[in-house]
């Protein structure tokens, strides 16, 4: 598999060879869906909480007498049937949302995503990407000159200037190869990988 190699200005200079075992796999939609759903589920904090009728603080006084009013009988205002009452089946923070995906499947899912991105022309390799100062304007102008408005940049190491310059750009994410997740790879329109980061990805997914 040949990937497009860009220079510092974002212009195509040549191609770089990439292993077919990572960037030449077939598109496996079911596996990608499983990996993405598992990643999102495992990222949940699981702290949602609702109160049942025992936990809602209401008076235990009977709202009205049992018979003779013409209204439906009622015991207390914390009943789940009432507005402001407790939930019948409340959510509790001890719920487990985690999905298990073994390492082999997770890596295969990442390879399938990277292969599809390469086929669609959304993935490119760049010599390096840096800015002279931690200024959002500098990085924004640089990416705009490359025609990139939504991009995930995978670098071999986090450059402080680049990281600080990207924090205020909503459609730009800078990360290392070990932090490249399936959700981000699918979400961003373009993926830029530095040459050194490409070697790390090959080593990680080999």
Curated annotation (Swiss-Prot):
Superkingdom of origin: Bacteria
Composition skew (Basic and acidic residues), residue ranges: 49-58
GO molecular function: rRNA binding; structural constituent of ribosome
Keyword Lipid biosynthesis: no
InterPro entries, alphabetized: Ribosomal_uL4, Ribosomal_uL4-like, Ribosomal_uL4_dom_sf
Annotated Basic residues bias: 59-70
Residue segments, region Disordered: 43-78
Keywords annotated in UniProt: Ribonucleoprotein, Ribosomal protein, RNA-binding, rRNA-binding
Gene3D superfamilies attached to this UniProt entry: 3.40.1370.10
GO cellular component, as recorded: ribonucleoprotein complex; ribosome
Stretch forming the signal peptide: none
Example GO BP: translation
Similarity field: Belongs to the universal ribosomal protein uL4 family.
PANTHER family, sorted: 50S RIBOSOMAL PROTEIN L4, LARGE RIBOSOMAL SUBUNIT PROTEIN UL4M
Subunit structure: Part of the 50S ribosomal subunit.
Function in brief: One of the primary rRNA binding proteins, this protein initially binds near the 5'-end of the 23S rRNA. It is important during the early stages of 50S assembly. It makes multiple contacts with different domains of the 23S rRNA in the assembled 50S subunit and ribosome.
HAMAP family: Ribosomal_uL4_B
Protein name: Large ribosomal subunit protein uL4
């Amino acid at each position: 598999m040949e990937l497009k190699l860009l220079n510092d200005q974002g212009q195509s200079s040549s191609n770089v060879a990439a292993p077919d075992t990572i960037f030449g796999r077939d598109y496996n939609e079911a596996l990608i869906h499983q990996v993405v759903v598992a990643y999102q589920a495992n990222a949940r904090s699981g702290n949602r909480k609702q109160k049942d009728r025992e936990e809602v603080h209401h008076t235990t006084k009977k709202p009205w007498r049992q018979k003779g009013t013409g209204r439906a009988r009622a015991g207390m205002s914390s009943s789940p049937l009432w507005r402001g009452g407790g939930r019948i089946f409340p959510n509790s923070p001890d719920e487990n949302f985690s999905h298990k995906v073994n390492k082999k499947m997770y890596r295969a899912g990442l390879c399938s995503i990277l292969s599809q991105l390469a086929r669609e022309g959304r993935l490119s390799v760049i010599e390096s990407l840096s800015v002279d100062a931690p200024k959002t304007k500098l990085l924004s102008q640089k990416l705009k000159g490359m025609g990139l408005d939504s991009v995930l940049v995978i670098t071999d190491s986090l450059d402080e200037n680049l990281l600080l310059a990207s924090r205020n750009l909503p459609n730009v994410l800078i990360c290392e190869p070990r932090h490249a997740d399936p959700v981000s790879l699918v979400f961003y329109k373009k993926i830029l990988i530095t040459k050194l980061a490409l070697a790390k990805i090959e080593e990680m997914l080999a």
